[in-house]
């Protein structure tokens, strides 16, 4: 459906829901269920390496920081005027995971060609039960149904994206089991994120200053050196790997002689880290511009009701 298509009852309903969500007001359980059932049909048709055209704005972790997502849209432009590619970790840690992920899924439904939403390591049943999304769903809906609806939907999110055959985008990093993009295209991704193996690595690995493959301190995925990213980019005719997954104080960080960039889009992460956030604008000519931003003003934010583990990875 084009951005300027004739309104139907479905798009009018979606526009109303998006308007409600932009005010940080959650949808009903029934609305979430209907939205996610339809979203599943769209996401099912997308590739494990989803092709994306430029211009596009590439974003990193959001982690339930809804007001900062609204600030991101204010700075970068609202969908569908701006095309977006989000690289995962929409939920956990922040206070508004429900509103954040619902808004992104609603925008995906309304403008499927204008927004791409990849899976992060937090789009998982196991992780969300520890780091906040499960508890938030219980608090806001009185039961775990919405958590189950979303975690079932997460299984359908694409794992990676490819911007104009040049920029490879994913949440985490590379895998010793993956040499080519075709290796990724051949996965069955519709499952909970495994504890090990190539699908796990794509969502958990990190670039490192040391050459070769290393054991990750996270307990999942690997670290990979410049030699690995150079070989992967050469084999697959890529110019850049864009990824998220790590807090970087300036909102973005180059690695491996500008073969890899980390983008992090949650400013003052966990409401205490003091970092900037950034987004990466890629224009029609594939030129890159980083836009940094600070936290949005927050009003009436709740206190954290229960201490969550200090897992800053």
Swiss-Prot record:
Residue positions binding Mn(2+) 2: 89, 121, 171, 245
Domain of life: Eukaryota
Residue(s) carrying Leucine methyl ester: 313
Enzyme Commission numbers on file: 3.1.3.16
Location, primary (coarse class): cytoplasm
Single Gene Ontology MF annotation: metal ion binding
CDD domains: MPP_PP2A_PP4_PP6
Modification after translation: Reversibly methyl esterified on Leu-313 by leucine carboxyl methyltransferase 1 (LCMT1) and pectin methylesterase 1 (PME1). Carboxyl methylation influences the affinity of the catalytic subunit for the different regulatory subunits, thereby modulating the PP2A holoenzyme's substrate specificity, enzyme activity and cellular localization.
Chain residues that bind Mn(2+) 1: 61, 63, 89
Description of how the protein assembles with itself and partners: PP2A consists of a common heterodimeric core enzyme, composed of a 36 kDa catalytic subunit (subunit C) and a 65 kDa constant regulatory subunit (subunit A), that associates with a variety of regulatory subunits such as subunits B (the R2/B/PR55/B55, R3/B''/PR72/PR130/PR59 and R5/B'/B56 families). Interacts with ACR4. Interacts with TAP46. Interacts with SIC/RON3.
Protein name: Serine/threonine-protein phosphatase PP2A-3 catalytic subunit
Organism: Arabidopsis thaliana (Mouse-ear cress)
